[in-house]
Amino acid sequence: MMAAIQASQLTLDVVLIEKNSYPGRKLLLSGKGRCNLTNNCDLDSFIARFSGNGQFLRDAFKKFFNQELIRFFEDRHLSLKIERQLRVFPETDKSDSVLEVLKKALNKNKVKIFYKTAMKDILLKEDRVKGLLLSDGSFIAADKIILATGGLTYSFTGSSGEGMKIAQRLGHHLVPLRPGLVPLETKQQYPKILEGLALKNIRLNFCDGKRKIISEIGELIFTDFGISGPLVLSLSGKIADWLSENKSVYVEIDLKPALSKEQLEARLFREFELNAKKTIKNTLKALLPKKLVDVFLDLAKIMPEKKVSQIMRAERQRIVSQLKALRLDISRCRPLENAMITRGGVSLKEINSRTMESRLIKGLYFAGEMIDVDADTGGFNLQAAFSTGYLAGESAAVEPLGL
């Protein structure tokens, strides 16, 4: 939509092909229905949140970055707010408010929208765009075409990768598609018992064999198949890469990252002195969420009704060790249909970063999730979609045909 809006600012004849009966179905789901539009951090910090290809977006961000996006919506009477970690949301907390602004901009610019229309192929003449063949057999002549069809996630919204398939048929290389911002499955079954339990301000130490490869603090949520939550999602891309190399990956959850092992042992010793007549189960409720206690003791091989005064030194040491390193072995990432974004896509080597035009086909442009860039949660991916869409739309409208 942003590509069509910007292109129609600069040229008269813009057509938007929409597979669904209304636009923006995927946008409505973003930010859990609240639409995390962007992030208010500086450019270098923003680019650092991408998984390795963020520098490709520097030209697009210089043209249309977070402040320009914020102005775009505020100039159209949508108030925005900045929340923790500099995440930007509409004041309404509703993604349909964002969609409404975009729809009005399309209407104002007289963009012609074909609803319930799917594309079948792009036709070329001497490596130059000639037009678009639709699924009903009709043909739309076009000098410029912008492909912004998204990835493979949330396929029920109509995002099923047609644009990538067409790009590949036209000779573009696709970096293998894989899930990003995705929950992780574990070999152990106890997360199912803890389903829904959120642990905040814990440290996750991901390990490859005996080597610690990531160590970050954040929030984790147990699920019926393993673990999820903001921290898990943001690290899942790296985990997926290691798993694809057949590496053995496990995570140690540090439930008390503010305390060293020695400090924690001293704290536990004090708790035991104060609660000698209580059961270990009741005593640990001062240190752990109630829902976690039984599972924790089962893993430590300690009877929950055992009196604190009966706890042996070796058992106390097991408790401390487990508080600092509750282990889960990662079996795999959830499949693409459970991911928030698609990693991979059209190779950046075949896209001009200054225009978003294909280096292989004149008049063909790319934008959004279908190109090989991806980032953490926090508004980074949506800003990349808006920025590449804006740049592609502007470039398509003003770039000469080069005949």
Question: Where on the chain are the PLM-derived regions?
Answer:
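Glycine-rich FAD pyrophosphate-binding loop
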Residues: 8-32
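N-terminal glycine-rich dinucleotide-binding loop that anchors FAD/FMN and/or NAD(P) in oxidoreductases
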Residues: 28-60
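Feature captures the FAD/FMN-dependent oxidoreductase FAD-binding
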Residues: 59-144, 293, 297
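A glycine-rich dinucleotide-binding beta-alpha-beta segment and adjacent secondary-structure elements
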Residues: 114-116, 121, 294-374
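A conserved FAD-binding loop/helix module that cradles the flavin
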Residues: 151-170, 373-401
